């Protein structure tokens, strides 16, 4: 359950309207690397995370991204309030204005509306954390690009804060990936040593192997007849190949 606190994570107090800048910053509201996608990505990924601390990390960061979404919406609103018709035309805000007036709509700066295809949830610890690391860097680059184009110090102050938080999130995800990789890799290596003895399956002596995509999702494949671990072939296929030899 979420509890809403009626304040922003960082104050947004923009004095001057700037529809051109608003049409760029809206990309971090509903663009491919924006805060809407980030919040949904992390809050969705947490369900399949196998460790409580990772569920908590994704819940915390996903919730913070909702706060960042609110900040971006506030920036765009303050940049576009009380616009005149001339401001809308000369500021390059007319295309957005036709569809949404001055409402806050999740879209990219290019005009494409938000699409769930811009986020990924694989249900695999390494795949999802790697996705999250890349997502934070892409968001950081987008904020860098906004800073290159913005000349409003009030806007830049908030954007710099949001950029800094993306770096912190990147660090937290990196720590989580490294820590869990070391712990689970150690467990997988211990398990592998226990099962590395030469075993006889009745027709051929094989070295048992623990196979998997990576130590965090290690799967032991077993012969259907003798129960010994194998990399890819069944005990029956081994007997057949030996008979042909």
Model regions and ranges:
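Non-heme di-metal
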Residues: 1-224
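N-terminal low-complexity segments that are often proline-rich with Ser/Thr-Pro
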Residues: 214, 222-245
């Amino acid at each position: 359950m979420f509890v809403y606190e009626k304040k922003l994570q960082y104050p947004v107090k923009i004095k001057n309207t700037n529809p051109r800048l608003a049409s760029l910053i809206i990309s971090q509201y509903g663009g491919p690397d924006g805060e809407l996608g980030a919040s949904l990505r992390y809050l969705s990924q947490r369900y399949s995370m196998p460790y409580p601390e990772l569920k908590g990390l994704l819940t915390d960061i996903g919730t913070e991204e909702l706060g960042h979404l609110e900040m971006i919406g506030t920036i765009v609103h303050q940049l576009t309030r009380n616009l005149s018709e001339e401001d809308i035309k000369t500021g390059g805000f007319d295309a957005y204005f036709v569809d949404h007036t001055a409402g806050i709509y999740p879209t990219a700066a290019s005009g494409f509306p938000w699409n769930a295809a811009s986020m990924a949830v694989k249900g695999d610890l390494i795949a999802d954390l790697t996705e999250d690391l890349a997502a934070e860097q892409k968001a950081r680059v987008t904020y860098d690009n906004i800073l290159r184009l913005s000349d409003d110090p009030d806007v830049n102050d908030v954007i710099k804060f949001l950029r800094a938080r993306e770096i912190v999130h990147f660090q937290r995800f990196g720590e989580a990936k490294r820590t869990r990789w070391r712990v689970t890799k150690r467990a997988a290596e211990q398990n592998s040593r226990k099962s590395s003895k030469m075993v006889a399956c009745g027709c051929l002596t094989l070295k048992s192997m623990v196979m998997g995509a990576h130590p965090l999702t290690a799967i032991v494949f077993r012969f259907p007849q003798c129960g010994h671990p194998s990399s890819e072939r069944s005990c029956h296929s081994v007997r057949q190949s030996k008979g042909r030899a």
